[in-house]
UniProtKB/Swiss-Prot annotation:
Organism: Cyanidium caldarium
GO cellular component: chloroplast; mitochondrial large ribosomal subunit
Gene responsible for this protein: rpl16
Name of the molecule in the record: Large ribosomal subunit protein uL16c
Subunit structure: Part of the 50S ribosomal subunit.
One GO molecular-function entry: structural constituent of ribosome
Pfam families: Ribosomal_L16
Record keywords: Chloroplast, Plastid, Ribonucleoprotein, Ribosomal protein
GO biological process, one term: mitochondrial translation
NCBIfam families attached to this UniProt entry: rplP_bact
Length: 140
């Protein structure tokens, strides 16, 4: 699973999910992609699950780019612990995704195979997503 090697701070504020993505909202590497339609947190486990589904479906045929990285730690207190006594310890890593952000990109496969792989991958994500294709290449 993905996680940063080193961070400036151990614990982060939760923050708010406002607005749409301005950067990372266009295809940059591949012909096809998965675009988020809603904003949410995506865990490193969910990213790994989607990666495995896509790679297995492409069967060594294409290339996959992961455009998001879980760089924010989410803390949690142990079960049955009284309130107070500080913030909990880092539990897992998340990527903050805003609507319009490209999550994954695929290249080197046909349009049909890419659509099938993306359809399977979207089931693994906790947000609404859509299939995106670069129009200049999608006329095969």
């Amino acid at each position: 699973m993905l996680s940063p090697k080193k961070t400036k701070y151990r614990k982060f504020h939760r923050g708010r999910l406002k607005g749409h993505a301005t950067k990372g909202s266009a295809l940059a590497f591949g012909r096809y992609g998965i675009q988020a339609l809603t904003s949410s947190w995506i865990t490193s486990r969910q990213i790994e699950s989607v990666r495995r589904v896509i790679v297995r479906h492409l069967k060594r045929g294409g290339k996959l780019w992961i455009r998001i990285f879980p760089d924010k730690a989410v803390t949690a207190k142990p079960l049955e612990t009284r309130m107070g006594s500080g913030k909990g310890s880092p539990e897992h890593w998340i990527a903050v995704v805003k609507s319009g952000h490209i999550l994954f990109e695929i290249d080197g496969v046909s349009l049909e195979l890419a659509k099938e792989a993306v359809k399977l991958a979207i089931y693994k994500l906790p947000i609404k997503c859509k299939f995106l294709s670069n129009d200049e290449f999608a006329k095969d």
